[in-house]
């Protein structure tokens, strides 16, 4: 047994020095002499993992568990190898099995948490939570017109808050169109084989994680360093930061190759509010970690802490930069959420910083000049810039709506009119321009309603009175073909929703077969409202 211990110690020293092949030879010779020694298989598993031979690391991890089923380290070795092999579900189960035997084993707990995080990453990411969601939808002509429909926005919010509903919504063509825009692929053109294809396996880890240390067989200096770290952790929890720093500093002196002791020091300075020192130590820790091939998760934590320090100082651009560095090393939900939060704050800050009413007025005047010359596209650009400079000026939206109407972009005109009315409910132009857009779309019933609202505000408004009369006459004299009526009606998002409702389709079929059923259905105010809408657009008529 003395020879076995000598070979084991020799292997440990070789592994610590980075001489992996020598370490493997020592452990293998020791195993020949003592094939039932579980520690030897555990150590050799660590050596194989460090070499990158993860299959053999896994086999030795399994042997360790077989020889000593109640030893947490064996499960840790086996799970780590499975993780390297991208067999995340099996790794998770192995960590869970190990915790049944050693419920308080920190390595197993941390390993399980990391596995759960990585498995969460592999699930389908919800595209409806993109930070620039509405900008993407606005920029694409396939979804731009849908945004004016309140039911569409409700649908988007529902899928943002409850992505599990996506499967039940795929029959809605609007959802498929939206996914095509957000994912940048034409889902409608994918053939069955493409749709049924399984996703490609994830790429191998970008950096080789460092195998876990062999607690029982660590050199004396590393054992002492771990003890100092624990003392430092106890002091840190008690907020005795000076004492914690002393212990972490001592641990670093004993084991200068372990970046954890430096990041722990950085954590103390973070709590003390000394963010410059915190960042300096994190950078040093990353340097040490790179030199010693540290686990990429530890590198990611150091970058995330730098990001957090900038976030605390409200330097969101710098925070985003380091959060992205952290995510490039290892993606975790917490850091991703923090990065998105910083991006949202920064975007709002930039928007507010851009506001300048004086420059907005200049752009508005330029837009007016272009509009009078008939250069509507250029006028629209000036009004858009003016809105960015002063987004609370209702008249700017009204002016841009006039441009959109001239350019026959009626849905966008309606959207701007709605914004104008919301900002300034008593501004007549907001109503008359909205009504004009509806009139141009030949939606005379809605147009008359809006003209009437303008007249309610100012009964002497000639533009509203004339518009109301025009719409009334047009409605009376229209002789559209059934195809024209149907095409125009189905362009209305509200009508689309009504006609895609299975219950409403059943009611309409009943009305065709049994006209007497109408009176029963009209007792329901919701159904009555929908039937009235279909009558208004000319899709149905009641005789």
UniProtKB/Swiss-Prot annotation:
There is a cross-link at residues 123, 210 (Glycyl lysine isopeptide (Lys-Gly) (interchain with G-Cter in SUMO2)). Residues 205-233 have a biased composition (Basic and acidic residues). One of its GO terms (biological process) is cellular response to interleukin-7. GO terms for molecular function: Hsp90 protein binding. The modification Phosphotyrosine is found at residue 354. Gene3D superfamilies: 1.10.260.100, Tetratricopeptide repeat domain. Residues 191-233 are annotated as: Disordered. There is a cross-link at residues 123, 210 (Glycyl lysine isopeptide (Lys-Gly) (interchain with G-Cter in SUMO1)). InterPro entries: STI1/HOP_DP (IPR041243), STI1_HS-bd (IPR006636), TPR-like_helical_dom_sf (IPR011990), TPR_rpt (IPR019734). The modification N-acetylmethionine is found at residue 1. GO terms for cellular component: cytosol; dynein axonemal particle; myelin sheath; nucleus; protein folding chaperone complex. Pfam families: STI1-HOP_DP, TPR_1, TPR_11, TPR_12, TPR_8. The modification Phosphothreonine is found at residues 198, 332. Acts as a co-chaperone for HSP90AA1. Mediates the association of the molecular chaperones HSPA8/HSC70 and HSP90. This is Stress-induced-phosphoprotein 1. It comes from Mus musculus (Mouse). The gene is Stip1.
């Amino acid at each position: 047994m003395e020879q076995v211990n000598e070979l084991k110690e020799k292997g440990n020293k070789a592994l610590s020095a980075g001489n992996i092949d020598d370490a493997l030879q020592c452990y293998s010779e020791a195993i020949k002499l003592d094939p039932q020694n579980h520690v030897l298989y555990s150590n050799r598993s660590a050596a194989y993992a460090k070499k990158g031979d993860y299959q053999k690391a896994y086999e030795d991890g399994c042997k360790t568990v077989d020889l000593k089923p109640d030893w947490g380290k064996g499960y840790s070795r086996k799970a780590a190898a499975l993780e390297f092999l991208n067999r995340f579900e099996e790794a998770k189960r192995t960590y869970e099995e190990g915790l049944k035997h050693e419920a308080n084993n920190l390595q197993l707990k941390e390993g399980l948490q990391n596995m759960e995080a990585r498995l969460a990453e592999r699930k389908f990411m919800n595209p409806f939570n993109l930070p620039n969601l509405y900008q993407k939808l606005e920029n694409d002509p396939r979804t731009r017109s849908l945004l004016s429909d309140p039911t569409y926005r409700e649908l988007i919010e529902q899928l943002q808050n409850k992505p599990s509903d996506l499967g039940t919504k795929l029959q809605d063509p609007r959802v498929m169109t939206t996914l095509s825009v957000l994912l940048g692929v034409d889902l409608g053109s994918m053939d069955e084989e493409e749709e049924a294809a399984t996703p490609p396996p994830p790429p191998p880890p970008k950096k080789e994680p460092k195998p876990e240390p062999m607690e029982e067989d660590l050199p004396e200096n590393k054992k002492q360093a771990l003890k100092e770290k624990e003392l430092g952790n106890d002091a840190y929890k008690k907020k005795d930061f000076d004492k914690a720093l002393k212990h972490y500093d001592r641990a670093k002196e004993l084991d200068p190759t372990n970046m954890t002791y430096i990041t722990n020091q950085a954590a103390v300075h973070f709590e003390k509010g000394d963010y410059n020192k915190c960042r300096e130590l994190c950078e040093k820790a990353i340097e040490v970690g790179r030199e010693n091939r540290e686990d990429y998760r530890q590198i990611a934590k150091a970058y995330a802490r730098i990001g957090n320090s900038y976030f605390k100082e409200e330097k969101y651009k710098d925070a985003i930069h380091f959060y992205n560095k952290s995510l490039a090393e290892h993606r975790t939900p917490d850091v991703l959420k923090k990065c998105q939060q910083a991006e949202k704050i920064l975007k709002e800050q930039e928007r507010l910083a851009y506001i300048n009413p004086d420059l907005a007025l200049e752009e508005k005047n330029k837009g007016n000049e272009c509009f009078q010359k008939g250069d509507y596209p250029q006028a629209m650009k000036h009004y858009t810039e003016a809105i960015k400079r002063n987004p609370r000026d209702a008249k700017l939206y009204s002016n841009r709506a006039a441009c959109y109407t001239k350019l026959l972009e009626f849905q966008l005109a309606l959207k701007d009119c709605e914004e104008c009315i919301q900002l300034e409910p008593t501004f007549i132009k907001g109503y008359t321009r909205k009504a004009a857009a509806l009139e141009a779309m030949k939606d005379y019933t809605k147009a008359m309603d809006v003209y009437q609202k303008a007249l309610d505000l100012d009964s002497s408004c000639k533009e509203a009175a004339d518009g109301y009369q025009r719409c009334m006459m047009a409605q009376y004299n229209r002789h559209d073909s059934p195809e024209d009526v149907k095409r125009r009606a189905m362009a209305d998002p509200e009508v689309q929703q009504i006609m895609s409702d299975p219950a409403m389709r059943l009611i309409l079929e009943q009305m065709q077969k049994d006209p007497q059923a109408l009176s029963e259905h009209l007792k329901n105010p919701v159904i009555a409202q929908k039937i009235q809408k279909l009558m208004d657009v000319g899709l149905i008529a009641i005789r």
